[in-house]
Amino acid sequence: MKHNNKVSKRLTMTWVPLLCISCFFLGAIFTSKLRSASSDSGSQLILQHRRDQELKIVTQDYAHEKKKSQDNDVMEEVLKTHKAIESLDKSVSMLQKQLSATHSPQQIVNVSATNSSTEGNQKNKVFMVIGINTAFSSRKRRDSLRETWMPQGEKLEKLEKEKGIVVKFMIGHSSTPNSMLDKEIDSEDAQYNDFFRLDHVEGYYNLSAKTKSFFSSAVAKWDAEFYVKIDDDVHVNLGTLASTLASHRSKPRVYIGCMKSGPVLTKKTAKYREPEFWKFGEEGNKYFRHATGQIYAISKDLATYISNNQPILHKYANEDVTLGSWFIGLEVEQIDDRNFCCGTPPDCEMRAEAGEMCVATFDWKCSGVCRSVDRMWMVHVMCGEGSKAVWDANLKLS
């Protein structure tokens, strides 16, 4: 028994150090693994944190770039708007340069009067300028007027110098430069010296443009108190016309003639069809009141207004309607004088016998004297005022 106890003690004493050493190494190995695991875990945490930081930076950069892009877009739109405003300002400025006046009719007239007085030193001052509307094919009509109420040669020149009355046939040019039509007018003008040539292409459907051209050109050449347009198939008493206009000298803006308000024609087959009929309201409406186109007169300020504003004055199909439309909205006195539209005999003859001499005579149904080439002489004999009337008119120039 004693021997066994001794053996047990020896074994115990031998294995204790071994167990301690083994435990030590096992502890060291376990601790090393724990440290290794802990180190790996820390590295992963650090890596994850770094990635989070990088993602945050990238996100912030993206947001910054997006905001920057949006800011650029906004700035680009602002620049576009600014450029558009500048372009609009330039357009308005150009339009303002084309207009002589932009605020009111009174200002327009004041500007017109100033321009006229400035240029007056270079223009002949006269009482009235009469433009007789004619065409290439109307030679016989022109001759019928030369043989009746329109003075010729030296008398025509004397009428301008002594009475301040200018009477001219107004005509443009053909669509082909230096055509036979133009040369025929050149030859006729060389013979009579009674044409006023316009920078205008002749044509029946261009009468509104021709009227605008006449007033503009006449204002540029003569400083007149009145400007008159007459058709070449109308009989006129020059002395009565001059005296009538002289009675309105004190009025600054007058529009004189036989005022009417005819229907707006919409049918395509109608001779005087108005393509822009819709501007005048419902079907069946009438035009605003305007002077009939056979003869009318306007004062200096209105003619100058047309000249100054011709680029923006709208033209309708009918010339007389067009002229009336230009004065809508202006402070203009319309004078409806029925002596401007007497009928042919017996109407004008009866008036003459009653002491009421007509300014102009024509037939409404023909928009002029019917068969004027054949009948103008008869009308002149029965309704004319006499050759001395125009020379007796008191037209002292102001």
Curated annotation (Swiss-Prot):
Keyword field: Glycoprotein, Glycosyltransferase, Golgi apparatus, Manganese, Membrane, Signal-anchor, Transferase, Transmembrane, Transmembrane helix
Disulfide-bond pairs as recorded: none
One CC-aspect GO term: Golgi membrane
Glycan-linked positions: 110, 115, 206
Domain of life: Eukaryota
Enzyme Commission numbers on file: 2.4.1.-
GO molecular function, one term: galactosyltransferase activity
Keyword Nuclease attributed: no
Pfam family for this entry, one: DUF4094
Topological type in the membrane: Single-pass type II membrane protein
Compartment(s) where it occurs, according to its Swiss-Prot or TrEMBL record: Golgi apparatus membrane
Cofactor entry: Mn(2+)
Enzyme class at the top of the EC tree: transferase
Pathway: Protein modification; protein glycosylation
GO biological-process terms attached to the record: protein glycosylation
The protein's role, per its UniProt record: Beta-1,3-galactosyltransferase that transfers galactose from UDP-galactose to substrates with a terminal glycosyl residue.
Family to which this protein belongs: Belongs to the glycosyltransferase 31 family.
PANTHER family recorded: BETA-1,3-GALACTOSYLTRANSFERASE 5-RELATED (PTHR11214:SF242), BETA-1,3-N-ACETYLGLUCOSAMINYLTRANSFERASE (PTHR11214)
Protein known as: Probable beta-1,3-galactosyltransferase 5
Organism: Arabidopsis thaliana (Mouse-ear cress)
